[in-house]
Amino acid sequence: MELFRNLWRRKLRSTLTITGIFMGIVALTTMGALAEHFNSLIAGGVTYFGGAIQVGDAKSGGSFGGGGFMALSKADELAKVDGVAAVSPGITVAAKPGDVNTVSFGLPDFISATDPNGEQYGAFKTQLTSGRRVQSDGEVELGSSMATEFNKKVGDTITLPKKPADAKPDFVTHDYTVVGILKQTLTEPDTGAFVTLHDAQTLLGDSLPAAIKTSVNPYQLAESMTVYGKPGVNLDNLADKINNEVTEVKATKPSVLVNSFKAGGAIFTAITTVAALLALVIGGLSVVNTMLMAVSERVREIGLKKAVGARTGNILREFVTESTLIGTIGGVLGFFVGWLITLVLGGSAGSGGLFLVTPRLTILSLGFAIILGAVAGVLPAFRAARMDPVIALRSVG
């Protein structure tokens, strides 16, 4: 009880000090949760793109964000390249297209062709929490976030793509039977709906501009190809071989994509570090100031304690404990409020969310606040502990 009594001798100063740590931990928690979510996406991307080669139309600059189309027949040519184990054509369309009034800070919902080869050859594998895999047209597997957003379970019917409020008269939707729900991955598949290649090609045809719809056969097209190598094959070398042997395509080396993902992760790690430093500067200096003032105001008390036998260690422990308590209170309150902020903002971030509060972040935030309080109290504690009791008693009339 004496600890709390000492803290509240100067209520305003203690409150401001706790507020300083509180603000720093709120920043650390929210920015850290943002970074944790982004890093989970990075980890999934590194695993997926590091285990396969992405191939796209050469004229559009390759597969990663090129936006072009390639002939489906290219899959057969790619499969004949020495070292290739399997080829999966890919098509992805928006699940909620065209609504300009929709604002989302998370990953967008999408519809994509299933990749049956991915489970056998790919490094990134998904699992089902219920149901089975897509086997025929008219069926769909839903990512965990998308299933929650649309409130769907196995056996339900889902209409995709979702018709926006500003849809044109020729906007087309299709009904699918939900046959499987994917286990949460904390990465891109969570916001996806996965259908057969034929159904994805149908959706691609629906999304084409009216001017070219009649002149293009979507069932002969793919947006990209995912190429899986045989065991032991160097994928970067295989990408070079594809570029040399197959015309009109551009194979991107897995190492290029992996490095781009890691670079993005480094940026968010830096953001978290800045938030931690902010907490250190604001909280640490405020604790040091408060404890130094406490020592100055309690000179006579310290002198009396030492005069009646209190040892240096007792005084040192008392002041370090007080500063640690300040850090703990500010840390707990800051983490709780930061967590609430992630819940509120996360609700407007689309089905994929925006924040991820992990056990690691919880330990980091609370541990940082407690250690900060303890370390910041060391200097004032030493000053108090080394005080001469005779001088201390004389300093106050």
Feature-to-residue mapping (PLM):
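N-terminal Sec/SRP start-transfer signal
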Residues: M1-A27, N39, G44, G397
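C-terminal membrane-exit region of the final transmembrane helix in multipass inner-membrane proteins
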Residues: E2-L3, R10, L361, S365-G397
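Transmembrane alpha-helical interface segments in multi-pass membrane proteins
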Residues: L16-T19, M23, T272, A279-V288, ...
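Hydrophobic, regular-secondary-structure patches
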Residues: V26-F110, S130-S136, D240-N244, E248-K250
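N-terminal membrane-entry
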Residues: T30, K262-A279
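Juxtamembrane alpha-helical signal-transduction segment immediately C-terminal to a transmembrane helix
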Residues: L34, F38, I42-G45, G264, ...
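Hydrophobic secondary-structure segments that place a key small or acidic residue at a functional site
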Residues: I91, D109-T114, T126-S207
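Mechanotransmission and gating elements of multispan inner-membrane complexes involved in transport
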Residues: D170-T177, I181-A270
